[in-house]
Amino acid sequence: MAALPSLRQLSYLVTLSETLHFTEAARRSFVTQSTLSGGIMELERLLGGVLVERDRQNVRLTPLGEQVVARARVLLADAQDLMRLSREMSEPLTGDLHLGIIPTIAPFILTQLLDEVHKQLPKIQLHLHEAQSEKIVERLEHGNLDMVVLALPFDTRGLKVADIAKENLYLVCNKHDKHSVNAHSLDDLDLSRLMLLEEGHCLRDHALSACPIGERKNDNRLKASSLPTLVEMVSSNLGFTLLPEIAINTHMLKFNDDLLVKEIENAPSRTLALITRKSTPLQSEFDVILDILKRITATLH
């Protein structure tokens, strides 16, 4: 059998792809620069191609290098899962669990989720990571997260997906916005006044999928960095927005006397989902957390 690349060599290449700097990549890998350079050169020899182009100013991956990095990330994540499998067989439902959640879900479930995980998985140390969908899916693929909670539709790229709940988006407007107050469907709304989260939030994409606002989606006045900011903009009668059902009965809306919340026809929807790698050794934990999330969301819908 021909010699195969080692996981260490692949790890060196992945780290270099993240830093594009040999000294920094060596520091992160806890080796000398010459050791890291030698490992990558040996990897290039084994694969029979140039992976990295170097000059005095720049380090960049070749097209082959980019493809190898993408595959290396999967192999390294699978290797981590393999190591975890042994521990999981001997000590199930114990240890650290890193869970990613998007910002348009996290605030509404975290308190109950932490309580239920503490009750049902007392030997699990839960670490929560909040970030936008693309970032947490990328971290899941790279093995930095064990599972993530996000909203579909979203490109899950061959990962294992389990639906939690489906929910509609509701119209939220200022009570003095007569046009929106009297609307019965999306067709009745003045979409030039639709307020959205900034790019990167999947809730923005879900709203836009049903609201063809054209070039106005590039208008900075339509963007908010967070749901509380978006609600404040609507409360000031700068426009209306569409919010998920999970947010409707929270203090963010319930105690704001300026706002009206109503269900409308043809409203877009989203599906909350729990996602992990197909190679995960944490299937038991996945099943428990999925059940917890289903019960939590059932109380919020």
Swiss-Prot record:
It comes from the Bacteria. Residues 22-41 bind DNA. InterPro entries: LysR_subst-bd, Tscrpt_reg_HTH_LysR, WH-like_DNA-bd_sf, WH_DNA-bd_sf. Keywords: DNA-binding, Transcription, Transcription regulation. One of its GO terms (cellular component) is protein-DNA complex. It holds the Pfam family HTH_1. The keyword Transcription regulation applies. Transcriptional regulator of the esterase operon. This is HTH-type transcriptional regulator EstR.
